Amino acid sequence: REVVFFTLGTTDLTQYTIAVDRVNNRVANMFRPTHPAVIRIMDMTITAGERENIPTAICGEMAGDITLLPLLIGLGATSMSVGVHLVPIIRYAIRNLDYGQCRDMAQKALQAPNSRFIVDLSTALARKSYPALFE
């Protein structure tokens, strides 16, 4: 109603949600953009946008990570903002994903107990969908 699009900056979202500064050597190893709290916030934002026909773009490091694309697409993200050098790779990956499989996997990820489980789910679907990018 008030906006025409949402953009989720995943790096800042992660940093502020789980209170971990990725450049602080003492805590940088705890920086996890797939932390269940981060994924749930992303889902709530995207779902709110969908209810009002507001598209949600993803920017930040997650958008260019081919292992996490199935998760982002499954959550309902409508576009990825990546560096120009990644555009062909991300486009290829997205074209090879099955939306239904991504949605099913994302629903499992939303119930996940930890970041590793979420990464494993998304990576498995990515490897199945575009194996050539992992060679």
Which stretches of residues belong to each language-model region?
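Non-catalytic helical/linker scaffolds that mediate oligomerization, partner binding
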Residues: 1-135
